[in-house]
């Protein structure tokens, strides 16, 4: 039983330090960043996306290569180029039975979309649902300054 919030934080830090064999910093998060306004690719009627707009694909699924369990995410992307919306939807759906880690999924998406549309600027962020309490939200960008901040979608 803990009497103060600081005791919880101390216990978490101590356990993580021991587990990772390193010095871990931990703090309470009292406010989460808002998820960006986006245009939902799942319901988009336009043939192509518009440059420099934020688009999201809700309900992305891949398969964990270790456990064979499904991993679900929302994929956010922005590009300086127009992208074919139906191609993107088919592409994201093609991962449904693919066994890959979150980070590799986002890296592959970045490379494939960049190459398919010759994008000069592109950023993709995968907001994966937690499994085992671990928050994995990889982002890949052509820019050093990231557009997507660390935010949580309501289903994370």
Which residue ranges define each predicted feature?
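N-terminal intrinsically disordered, cationic/polar leader segments
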Residues: 1-156
